[in-house]
């Protein structure tokens, strides 16, 4: 909550997306490998991790709500979504764990698309403050549509990939009788929708403040492909779910 927003803003967009979409998942992998597969953590510790995961998601989402730097908003969003992943792992039943593992993939696709869209916008406008932008959907339609699709996946709207993974996490919390956890997870999803739609509205809708043409096909093509993958991952979610269920079976062996 202190260093990651700065780490997401300072480097180039490509470095930031690798960090947000891939490198931050290393801690998730280590937790799953050590405390779900190798050791069985005490129930009190498990509940403590659940509480920290919920608080982490809420605080980071609140930070994204009040931030105006587009890359910093996405960095706060990464913290919030990692909290979501840890939430499913800490609930530690097969449904929630499956949702967390699936969301590692879905978040990676969508967040990479969001960071690259932000990079295209910054490269075209030379601005990072979303209050200084506006109306870019007129000049950058493909970037705008790709950003919107990836945002919908992170929010968890059907039929995109993020919907199924977040649904599994929430269902897992309910099965574990953690109703308050499921309720706060839903509230975090609402905050996620608010700050990402705020970014889309201020950057791409409204009055055109900065004339910024669409970038090269190679740049726009990458974000379009990531947005397309986010859609296909939702329609064909059964394919990654086969691997997720296999991994879940091994990780949660001690529950059987």
What kind of feature is each model-predicted range?
Residues 1-202, 207:
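Hydrophobic transmembrane alpha-helices and their helix-loop junctions in integral membrane proteins
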Residues 140-143, 193-256:
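Cytoplasmic/organellar membrane-interface segments at the starts of transmembrane helices
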